[in-house]
Swiss-Prot record:
The chain crosses the membrane at residues 15-45, 60-87. Component of the cytochrome c oxidase (complex IV, CIV), a multisubunit enzyme composed of 14 subunits. The complex is composed of a catalytic core of 3 subunits MT-CO1, MT-CO2 and MT-CO3, encoded in the mitochondrial DNA, and 11 supernumerary subunits COX4I, COX5A, COX5B, COX6A, COX6B, COX6C, COX7A, COX7B, COX7C, COX8 and NDUFA4, which are encoded in the nuclear genome. It comes from Ailuropoda melanoleuca (Giant panda). It catalyses: 4 Fe(II)-[cytochrome c] + O2 + 8 H(+)(in) = 4 Fe(III)-[cytochrome c] + 2 H2O + 4 H(+)(out). Residues 46-59 are mitochondrial matrix. Residues 1-14, 88-227 are mitochondrial intermembrane. Mg(2+) binds at E198. GO terms for molecular function: copper ion binding; cytochrome-c oxidase activity. The modification Phosphotyrosine is found at Y218. This is Cytochrome c oxidase subunit 2. Belongs to the cytochrome c oxidase subunit 2 family. The gene is MT-CO2. Cu cation A1 binds at H161, C196, C200, M207. GO terms for cellular component: mitochondrial inner membrane; respiratory chain complex IV. GO terms for biological process: ATP synthesis coupled electron transport.
Length: 227
């Protein structure tokens, strides 16, 4: 989860988020090198009055600064397309959970079970227990098995919402009349927090998401107790 004064991304919990972190570092290094080169050239231009007459109208230089940016863009585009393909790929999910956005709470339905559904509201500040997080805790957590492919079906009952959990690299729009889907897989147990990431009204900031990733045996006991 995020920490105060954090400047980097959250720790990766899913394979997709690990790929996104690698892509972020890859792109950031390219941007850093380009920025350093531009700043170096600007500093040289500002500190010298000499002019290289051979580069004022050189076809070779124009060819280089046309081809080189194209190569750099390809170096950025190819990893990006690979990750986009991975995020859209869905292979035989072990569990399907339907998520509906409301003003201003989430409802969840485990479609593989009968009558396993609940609403998830933010826990008011005055009801928080010691150690719980303000504006991030909910009354009903989404309990899911770890190390399994889970499909999330996401839609909305009223206005636009967005279901996002940064540690898992997830952000999917909840659109009325449309059913979007995404997959997740957590590699370790724990609590993972997210929030609605689409402005949806006055209480937009009070729609937290809490995923509790647990071993399969614990999930089976939990699901049996909920039925």
């Amino acid at each position: 989860m995020a920490h105060p004064f954090q400047t980097g991304l959250q720790d990766a919990t899913s394979p997709i988020m690990e790929e996104l972190l690698h892509f972020h570092d890859h792109t950031l290094m390219i941007v850093f090198l380009i920025s350093s080169l531009v700043l170096y050239i600007i500093s040289i231009m500002l500190t010298t009055k000499l002019t290289h007459t051979n580069t004022m109208d050189a076809q070779e230089v124009e060819t280089v600064w046309t081809i080189l940016p194209a190569i750099i863009l390809i170096m950025i585009a190819l990893p990006s397309l690979r990750i986009l393909y991975m995020m859209d790929e869905i292979n035989n999910p072990s569990l399907t959970v339907k998520t509906m956005g409301h003003q201003w709470y989430w409802s969840y339905e485990y479609t593989d079970y009968e009558d396993l559904s609940f609403d998830s509201y933010m826990t008011p500040t005055q009801e928080l227990k010691p150690g719980e997080l303000r504006l991030l805790e909910v009354d009903n957590r989404v309990v899911l098995p770890m190390e399994m492919t889970i499909r999330m079906l996401i839609s909305s009952e009223d206005v636009l919402h967005s279901w996002a959990v940064p540690s898992l690299g997830l952000k999917t729009d909840a659109i009325p009349g449309r059913l979007n889907q995404t997959t997740l897989m957590a590699m370790r147990p724990g609590l993972y927090y997210g929030q609605c990431s689409e402005i949806c009204g006055s209480n937009h900031s009070f729609m937290p998401i809490v995923l509790e990733m647990v071993p399969l045996s614990y999930f089976e006991k939990w699901s049996a107790s909920m039925l």
